Amino acid sequence: MTEKPTESDEAPAHTHADEEITPDAAPDFTVYNKEGNPVRLSDMKGIPVVLNFWASWCPPCKAEMPDFDEIAKQYEGRVAFMMVNLTDGQSETLDSAKSFISSMGYTFPVYFDTTSEAAYAYGIQSIPTTFFIDAEGYFVAYYEGSMSGDTLLRGISMIYAEIQ
């Protein structure tokens, strides 16, 4: 991974296109939508992706969700949001995650990592963690912890040309 958007007022110094290193391809994985159908990250190829790992019991995850929901609506059809719930069946179940999303009225796409395949592929150690993946399927930036709407927009600007 190449760059971490910051909470500072300054925009990131460069995007992956300006870097001297070879960007890493984002690992593919399978998660499940609310209907139980499998969805792969590779299904999103050709569109930039904001990939967020979260759980309903996580206060920092809950704090950033209103901004994610609002911004996901603004970029619908242009940037894919994959809000991946860490559904381990113990501290987080399908029912608890679905109930939380429903009670808050969030409309962003939620996916369930019931096998921990995605969390393992991305080495998730803490949540929330967000990855910004370009339309070609390469990591551009990441952020660990709860992020503000401004930081989310800075990350999107690194993968979506219309707001760079």
Regions found by a protein language model. Give the residues of each.
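Short, internal strand/loop/helix patches
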Residues: K98-E136
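Short pre-active-site segment immediately N-terminal to redox-active cysteine/selenocysteine motifs
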Residues: I47-V49, W54-W57, S126
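Hydrophobic beta-strand anchors of alpha/beta hydrolase catalytic cores
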Residues: V50-L51, F81, T130
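Conserved redox-active cysteine motifs that mediate thiol-disulfide chemistry
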Residues: F53-K73
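A short beta-strand-turn-helix
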Residues: E20-P23, D28-V49, K73
